[in-house]
Amino acid sequence: AVKTITLNLVSPSANRYATFLTEIRDNVRXRSLDYSHSGIDVIGAPSSRDSXLNINFQSP
């Protein structure tokens, strides 16, 4: 499966950029892993069942 995330550079804002970064973070972290039981999610090791993350930059 492919998840596409787009950053709109036509009318950028701090909120859109923050949302863009959150979407990337939410789609690459392995929720079953955390850093030293701190509750901080980490990126999981690659597997043969991984999905792809497609990042688009929309410009004028």
UniProtKB/Swiss-Prot annotation:
Catalytic reactions of this protein: Endohydrolysis of the N-glycosidic bond at one specific adenosine on the 28S rRNA
Keywords: Antiviral protein, Hydrolase, Pharmaceutical, Plant defense, Protein synthesis inhibitor, Toxin
Biological process, per Gene Ontology: defense response; negative regulation of translation; regulation of defense response to virus
UniProt xrefs under InterPro entries: Ribosome-inact_prot_sf, Ribosome_inactivat_prot_sub1
Gene3D superfamilies the UniProt entry points to: Ricin (A subunit), domain 1
Enzyme Commission number(s) from the entry: 3.2.2.22
Gene Ontology molecular-function annotations: rRNA N-glycosylase activity; toxin activity
Family: Belongs to the ribosome-inactivating protein family. Type 1 RIP subfamily.
Function of the protein: Single-chain ribosome-inactivating protein.
Name the UniProt record assigns to this protein: Ribosome-inactivating protein dianthin-32
Species name: Dianthus caryophyllus
